[in-house]
């Protein structure tokens, strides 16, 4: 697999960056991808999106309107970025030497999609142990309050996992049960505006949400990539190993070591 060349590689975090992440539960990485690399990625993402998605339908579900999973199966440039880009360097510094990919998807709020997405933790959608997985959101557009940028509560990861297990049954998933969390006081919440090419890294327990896209002229397109310890297991699945491509280091699970190995030559 060809290496991904970003604006700076490998991506090294400062001591202050790591301390800030520990305190606040998030880290903004400005200009992680320069424009020359970003535009081809966006083009491949949009080609994949238009192959599988219709125009925004206000009567459709969030999954149908806003999410395209396994984008690394549909875009070779995303695959290179996911498997060998600067976010893997970041994951090693925040998680440890042994890293696997846990999720790749497009999370889009196209113009006209004014539906908000409530407070939640990403570990609530797929609880992993150890609880040091990170979610990364790379902005494919400029994102601000008008077009639905992320909001988060700094330091909220320290509260640990909020139990939403009653909404994780097979029946609940089929019904697309809401996993949002009621927050008594969100006055400490802050918006996280991003420029295209920036990324934000979130601890798996950090509370975050987004408002609808109120812009009539701009989309808010995000490349969402999740990384975990190579030995992370799915708590909701009898502590079976989370399957994902082994990107750095080693795993004690053979099925992780072999997972999607055929993609590394493509």
Task: Specify the residue positions occupied by each region the protein language model found.
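Short, conserved beta-strand element in jelly-roll/cupin
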Residues: 120, 127-145, 193-196, 201, ...
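Double-stranded beta-helix
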Residues: 145-209
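Short, solvent-exposed loop/turn segments at secondary-structure junctions
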Residues: 34-35, 107-109, 143, 157-158, ...
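Short, charged/polar surface micro-motifs in flexible loops or helix N-caps
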Residues: 87, 111-113, 142-145, 158, ...
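Non-heme Fe(II)/2-oxoglutarate
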Residues: 3, 43, 51-59, 199-201, ...
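A generic structural micro-feature
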Residues: 62, 127-132, 215-219
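Active-site glycine-rich loop that binds ribose-phosphate moieties when present
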Residues: 117-123, 138, 175, 185
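Non-heme Fe(II)-dependent double-stranded beta-helix
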Residues: 1-24, 29-128, 165, 247-256
